[in-house]
Amino acid sequence: FAFAMGLDPFAAYDDRDQYESIMAKVEDRLIDCKSNVKTYWTGGDQLLALLRTGEVKAAMAWDAGGWKLNAENPDIRFVAPESGALGWIDTFAIPRRSENEEAAYKWINFVMQPEIAARITNASGNFTASKGADEFVKADLRDAYRESFDEAAINNIKWYPPVPPGLETMEGQVLDRVQAAN
């Protein structure tokens, strides 16, 4: 929500006072528009059901859920917000004392091959960072991705940095106050 207000919370991650100031502004804005909120996140299935029935008209959600709904009903589309989508890339980690580091690298290299990564994408609905995999992804999923994320949207993704200790607690307290507000 901060990005839509022209604020950059990620730039304030190393300055707790500045981050707290941003969160206070976000809290005030969220309380101001609380009458537009039907519900708060409890799970993906609930969110998809609310959109399917038309009980809600817009939602903040992951792209894969939006693409699933679009496959069911072309009138429902997932679009990146003008202020920028939030982005992260799931990663692989090998423990320092791994018993078979060579096998771990072989597995990572295997699943990141474009053809294999595309199979995972086709099964999960989540897109992949494997370069060239889009050539092997089902056409409808690939087209939905391209419709949601044109080059401008990709260039405007706000990539999550590591979250410093204590900020998630602060965010949770803001959400508690927003939910409790009249």
Regions found by a protein language model. Name each.
Residues 1-2, 27-31, 48, 52, ...:
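Non-transmembrane alpha-helical segments in soluble domains
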Residues 1-4, 8-79:
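Ligand-binding pocket segment of bilobal, Venus flytrap-like solute-binding proteins
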Residues 18, 22, 39-43, 86, ...:
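Extracytoplasmic/periplasmic, Sec-exported soluble proteins
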Residues 29-33, 72-96, 141:
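Periplasmic-binding protein-like
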Residues 49, 151-182:
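Conserved C-terminal helix/tail region of periplasmic/extracytoplasmic solute-binding proteins
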Residues 85-86, 90, 95-155:
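Mature extracytoplasmic/periplasmic domains
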